């Protein structure tokens, strides 16, 4: 058999590379793919060709695709998000080569990449861009496919795609758009359930995930009752599946408590947070970051109620939270946040001296490393307390320290630095005015005394 010209032999590899370049994926991601697509000729290949055998150029990309799909799960399980995302890009490029750009499996790979950008990288803009590109192809194949097996996969992919779009819109503070797309995910999930005789176990986006996302989108639209209904459903589903004491309920109780607080239903919010706290203690022990956070949330819920009978509970749970964080040697930011929340409550309840003492002892401990933002806030709060008490000198000293840290952390032109500087300048003018007034009075008093003495002597 006559040997093919060199240009023809290399054209397959060049075509494969051209496809990858059309996707908009960075060029460096395609380097390895070119070598996998390009069927480099060896003496053995030549022998096969001479024997009348044809080399299947797609066999190598198919093998690479299977390997890449396996690697994705391995990287995700190992919490290697960036590597997993790179493999998703590789899968998409290989799917274009193996199936063609208009095939639903290629659109599925692109939808998977979009979901990866959302869940692995936290990049909603990129997630939306890729999901929108994949949508039309998947919808066309959904209408035209006759295979139940393919339709099930397409429906599952559409659930994932619309969920990705919904959550991406939600992260960009567009509640209505988020809700519309999540409803589409819900409709496709219902269709998948019917086609699968009610069994949808093991799909990537679960019913619970979708229900929670719908609840959050409802909350973003300020539809409190609807949000409440979704979270109640999510809680019921989790309890039916895993019981009353599963740690999965903690975040759900905390979120539904937030909704109840917005509805001014403080007693119900407190009940939910008490349940979250109890599960934290039983699941993680009393000295754990989860329990410390739950304790702080419960303290704030008691404080938000404004009820005098909860005053002791506020102190108890704030002190538990702070003590737990300090025992664990937790992140300085978390400890300072709990202390500042407690001090805010103390100030609101007229205990400025106690708040000041606590803030001062916190700073004097010197265990807060590089938490510049929180330390600056602490100095600001202490300065505000001193100002409220009429101690201008102490307030100026504390606000000066706050401004110094803010200028280092944010820069002197940042709004926080500018606001602190304005307040500091105002206090300094007041102190100067007070000093001048005092001196004037003293001088005036001295002159009056001299006149009185002279009069008496005469």
UniProtKB/Swiss-Prot annotation:
- State the species of origin: Mus musculus (Mouse)
Recite the UniProt keywords alphabetically.
Coiled coil, Cytoplasm, Cytoskeleton
User: Which InterPro entries does UniProt cross-reference here?
Assistant: TPR-like_helical_dom_sf, TPR_rpt, TTC23/TTC23L
Q: Where in or outside the cell is it found?
A: Cytoplasm, Cytoskeleton, Microtubule organizing center, Centrosome; Cytoplasm, Cytoskeleton, Spindle; Midbody
Q: Which residues form a coiled coil?
A: 175-198, 246-278
User: Is the keyword Amino-acid biosynthesis assigned to this protein?
Assistant: no
UniProt-recorded name of the protein: Tetratricopeptide repeat protein 23-like
Of the GO CC terms on this record, one is: centrosome
UniProt keyword Cytoplasm present: yes
